[in-house]
From Swiss-Prot:
Subcellular localization, as worded in the UniProt entry: Nucleus membrane
Phylogenetic classification of the source organism: Eukaryota, Fungi, Dikarya, Ascomycota, Taphrinomycotina
Protein name, as recorded: Uncharacterized membrane protein C70.04c
Ranges of biased composition (kind: Polar residues): 35-49, 235-244
GO cellular component, one term: nuclear envelope
Topological category with respect to the lipid bilayer: Multi-pass membrane protein
Region (Disordered): 30-49, 224-244
Amino acid sequence: MKQNNKKPLPSKTKEISLETDWIDVIETMRETNESPKSQNPSEEATTVNELSCEAKPKLLFTPTKSSLSIGNFPYKEFDPVLKFPGIHYTYSRERLWGTCVILSTLFWSYYVLSNSELLEFEASEYSLLFILIIALDALLTVSLFGLFHHLMFLTTNYSYTINSTLDISKGFFINVLSTMVQALVTVTIAFTKFVTIDFPIYVFSSLFLYHPLSRSRQLPTKMQLDGSGERKTDSSLVHQNPPN
């Protein structure tokens, strides 16, 4: 039998052994991978800037109800339960509970007024006290219902946006209506002998009507996108105690 004296074909890739000079290998790789530099340095800078922009994730987006969360727990205070047609305003669970508190307050004031034994006094004796109560009630109403609630929705970008003034005006109009109902309840209770229960009922109903304001938590005002394209909140704004 004839022996096969054919030499092996030369491989394009250089075989690397233990005795290979690694400095030569690295220099060879640099020479093969080196691309010709452009003559214009501005074009090279533009190419680098474009590549760096493409590598960064886009951070500009509009937060929605599903993306607004604290950690892994959804922000349940803003989950819509009822939504009125034609009005960009939603009722959460806490606001529904606060509405029940106001209705119970109305029922209690009606019960007090319907009892003739509780109205045996002259209103002129308490006129100064009535004016003071109404003034303090108006101050609390403006601070709680107007300012904090308005700024809360502006910072969270949930239902209202900064550019959408129409939705903000509708929501503020509804707040004014609820404020008028609350003031009517306060004045009704003030014209009875149960003046001392006016402020506890008002504070109680206000805290439940605007439940997120009664908790010391940081509202998520900054949203980010990670490398995978998923939306997440800033780590500094993650709440330690998740809502029940």
